[in-house]
Amino acid sequence: MTVTRFSVFVIALLLSLGYGSNASAKGKGYDPHIDPTNFQTKVDNPYLPLVPGTTYKYLEKEGRDTRENIVTVMPDTKVVMGITCTVVHDVVNEKGALKEDTFDWYAQDKEGNVWYFGEDTKEYKKNGVDTEGSWEAGVGPNQPGIIMPSHPTPGKPFRQEYGPGHAEDMGQVIALHETVTVPDGTFKDCVKTKEWSLLESGHENKWYAKDIGVVRTESTTKEVVTLISVTHQ
């Protein structure tokens, strides 16, 4: 049997991400090979396209509480680990007051995997501003992870981020071809994921629609997030 260069690359990538071992669960041995020449400037994965000028409006509900979540793909970029990342601005408002203000950094490799390289986040609380969730890949032990694989397939968990003690989110594709109805419409053939943090209890399920991205999120805390609208500049 002939093993192609592409096959060797894929095998190496999966092993570096912890597939087929317990490295992804414990963090030990997680050291993905990041080559800037293997990344492109656009993020055009069908299930997580990040087109500058696109704004997503979501409604968050948990019991009687509601919050507005506005996610905007910025024209700005940020270089992380030598890679030009797309900047996404994520704002959460509650009763007209700013609650969270975050800048996330994403990049896509040439195989189509969307990587998460960190965030600059501020959470506004009664006693001040909390920036504990901020982290950047390549700084100290922090490493990037994959948010959306190039070819989503139900299987083993993978790391979405790795900052020991403060950024340890995991992801797992659990279903394909899901149909989801939200205020923005009905979407077929959605990818369903399970996502959780190794630092906290509980998890959430997300549905990603083709050519859109996240359209619905359900958490074990009973929080439900639905897509209200998508606009393009």
Segments and roles (model prediction):
Residues 8-18:
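Bacterial N-terminal signal peptides
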Residues 1-9:
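Bacterial N-terminal signal peptides that target proteins for export
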Residues 26-233:
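Conserved functional acidic sites
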Residues 17-26:
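Bacterial Sec-dependent signal peptides at the C-terminal "C-region" and cleavage site
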